[in-house]
């Protein structure tokens, strides 16, 4: 079995820069492929701001929560299909060709959204982009992983995660840049065509993965690429490892066959693949059920829930969370090969659970202390302006004590804040563009998604802390684990299965978030995510081994007998890898 590797394989960011400085070709490969991560991040993040303006242009979107959820989640639905096809396509045609196809899909989707004249056209464009996101989500880290020396593999794969978060941060900047430009959301959604074109051109100049080439009997090309990546004295050892993997793969195929269904059956009958999938799917599902993409897809909306009514203000504040996510990815690059994948994820999950519980408490307090309804102001605001649900109480001596701003919004009405003091009682009125304009004309603020709150700043603080603890661990590490935990012969297939599990979980979360907040409130929704995060933490501890510093072939040996955490493992000299 593999001996404990942490001391001998420790690495710091200085070595990463030294290696890539001496061999700049490695960084060129990583950054070019990583643009797929940038596109992934941009196209999933840009909708957070664009949705606010899509709602303003299309009344039916503003009035239908389910339509908003479809626009947001259709990219995720497309990504499920893209990831599923991508696994097969990667193995059949190679990593490089898969990236090129993803770029074409990104470009087509962007063009469709730019010319959209109705919500269904936006949905179609989001679907096309989703196909590209799904392929990029598994292909970019896989390509980088197979092009990287083992000692800095984790850090270089983290560049893909960094570019995902960088793409999300860029999308928020672009959103702010086009706030006052005619066609706001069209520009926001269309800008993604530019990096797609750039990556397409760059990938035309780069080679295929040496591992895929060797598997497809293009050994001379594979050797040529390895000689450009590894020092001369390491090339033969790497080729020997590839030869052994391909020999084992060929032997397997002679037994299980060559078709997709045969490979799937063979993969599931292989204990190494089964144990790898248990770990890979666990981290992918856990990544989504901490609720991260509710923050990334809906962060301006969440901040409006917290009391920031202005679109521009909400987007500017949301930029903070996106920026912290990008910074956290840099931190991951610094520590993932020093402290290990497993430890970073476990620490990250503890922090996530803490922040989610506190956020639930913050939103609960904000709801309980929302401004009361001023009966006279609601009745006299304008002719036929009073919220229909509140109108019967305007004639009573005093309205029910449970009527506050939050109660008003629950009946799909709007709250016009008190002109003198935002936290004082205000008017509960009909929600319409005319009433919003009238409220603003009186120098007051109109709220329709959240209420004025003294707790709003706490929501920003703990959303920021949530991102800080998420990004270095659960943000990037699941993709690293899935790029190195499967045998070469099943890597594309198993990586596709794990990526599909990620996107299916993502779809569940993004498609239900607004519905959940309507049903149980923001507080209850964050509490649900805290509970699902606790479940995810347990299964990560139970099923996910440490792969830091291991060759792909060593990972296979680690998984042969199944992984058990040290607490559940008999103490023997044959313990595989020290894990917490």
Swiss-Prot record:
Q: Which Gene3D superfamilies match?
A: MFS general substrate transporter like domains
> One of this protein's Pfam families, by short name?
Sugar_tr
Record-annotated membrane-spanning stretches: 34-54, 69-89, 104-124, 127-147, 161-181, 187-207, 289-309, 316-336, 344-364, 455-475, 493-513, 524-544
Q: Cellular location of this protein?
A: Membrane
Which GO MF term does the entry hold, naming one? symporter activity
Q: How does it sit in the membrane?
A: Multi-pass membrane protein
Q: Which cysteines are joined by disulfide bonds?
A: none
Taking the record's annotation, the residue ranges forming a coiled coil are none
Q: Which PROSITE patterns match?
A: MFS, SUGAR_TRANSPORT_1, SUGAR_TRANSPORT_2
Q: Which family does it belong to?
A: Belongs to the major facilitator superfamily. Sugar transporter (TC 2.A.1.1) family.
In terms of SUPFAM superfamilies, this protein maps to: MFS general substrate transporter
Q: Which InterPro entries match?
A: MFS_dom, MFS_sugar_transport-like, MFS_trans_sf, Myo-inositol_Transporter, Sugar/inositol_transpt, Sugar_transporter_CS
Instruction: Give a GO cellular-component term.
Output: membrane
Organism equals: Arabidopsis thaliana (Mouse-ear cress)
* NCBIfam families tied to this protein: SP (TIGR00879)
What is the name listed in the Swiss-Prot or TrEMBL entry for this protein? Probable inositol transporter 3
**What UniProt keywords apply to this chain's record, in alphabetical order?**
Membrane, Symport, Transmembrane, Transmembrane helix, Transport
Q: Its function?
A: Plasma membrane inositol-proton symporter.
């Amino acid at each position: 079995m593999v001996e404990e590797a942490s001391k001998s394989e420790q690495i710091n960011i200085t070595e990463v820069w030294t290696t890539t400085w001496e061999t700049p070709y490695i960084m060129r490969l990583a950054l070019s492929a990583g643009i797929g991560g940038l596109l992934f991040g941009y196209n999933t993040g840009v909708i957070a701001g664009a949705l606010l303006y899509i709602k303003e242009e299309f009344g039916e979107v503003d009035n239908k929560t389910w339509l908003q959820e479809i626009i947001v989640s259709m990219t995720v639905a497309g990504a499920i299909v893209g990831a599923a096809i991508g696994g097969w396509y990667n193995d059949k045609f190679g990593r490089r060709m898969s990236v090129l196809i993803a770029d074409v899909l990104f470009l087509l989707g962007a063009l469709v959204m730019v010319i959209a004249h109705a919500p269904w056209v936006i949905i179609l464009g989001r679907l096309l982009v989703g196909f590209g996101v799904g392929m990029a989500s598994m292909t970019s880290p896989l390509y980088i992983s197979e092009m990287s020396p083992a000692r800095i593999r984790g850090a270089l794969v983290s560049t893909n995660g960094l570019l995902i978060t960088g793409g999300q941060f860029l999308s928020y900047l672009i959103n702010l840049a086009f706030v006052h430009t005619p066609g706001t959301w069209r520009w926001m959604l269309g800008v993604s065509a530019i990096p797609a074109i750039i990556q397409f051109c760059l990938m035309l100049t780069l080679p295929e993965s040496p591992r895929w080439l060797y598997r497809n009997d293009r050994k001379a090309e594979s050797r040529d690429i390895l000689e450009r990546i590894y020092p001369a004295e390491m090339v033969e050892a790497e080729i020997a490892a590839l030869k052994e993997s391909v020999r084992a793969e060929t032997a397997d195929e002679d037994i299980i066959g060559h078709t997709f269904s045969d490979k799937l059956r063979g993969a599931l009958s292989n204990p190494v693949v089964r144990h790898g999938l248990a770990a890979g799917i666990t981290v992918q599902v856990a990544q989504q059920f901490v609720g991260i993409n509710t923050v990334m897809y809906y962060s301006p909306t969440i901040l409006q829930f917290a009391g920031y009514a202005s679109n521009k203000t909400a987007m500017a504040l949301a930029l903070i969370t996106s920026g912290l996510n990008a910074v956290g990815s840099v931190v991951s690059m610094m520590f993932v090969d020093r402290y290990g994948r497993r430890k970073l994820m476990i620490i990250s999950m503890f922090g996530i659970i803490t922040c989610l519980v506190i956020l639930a408490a913050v939103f609960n307090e904000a709801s309980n202390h929302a401004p009361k309804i001023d009966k006279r102001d609601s009745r006299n605001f304008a002719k036929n302006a009073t919220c229909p649900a509140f109108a019967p109480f305007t004639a009573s001596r005093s309205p029910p004590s449970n009527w506050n701003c939050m109660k008003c919004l629950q009946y799909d009405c709007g709250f016009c804040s008190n002109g003198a003091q935002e936290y004082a009682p205000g008017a509960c009125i009909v929600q319409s563009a005319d009433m919003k304009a009238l409220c603003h004309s009186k120098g007051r603020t109109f709220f329709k998604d959240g209420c004025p709150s003294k707790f709003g700043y706490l929501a920003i603080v703990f959303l920021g802390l949530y991102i800080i603890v998420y990004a270095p661990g659960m943000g990037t590490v699941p993709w690293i684990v899935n790029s190195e935990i499967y045998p070469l012969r099943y890597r594309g297939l198993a990586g596709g299965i794990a990526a599909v599990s990620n996107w299916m979980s993502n779809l569940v979360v993004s498609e239900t978030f607004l519905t959940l907040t309507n049903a149980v409130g923001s507080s209850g929704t964050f509490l649900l995510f805290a509970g699902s995060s606790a479940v995810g933490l347990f299964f990560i501890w139970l099923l996910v081994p440490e792969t830091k510093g291991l060759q792909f072939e060593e990972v296979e040996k680690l998984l042969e007998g199944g992984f058990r955490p040290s607490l559940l493992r008999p103490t023997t000299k044959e313990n595989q890898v020290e894990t917490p």
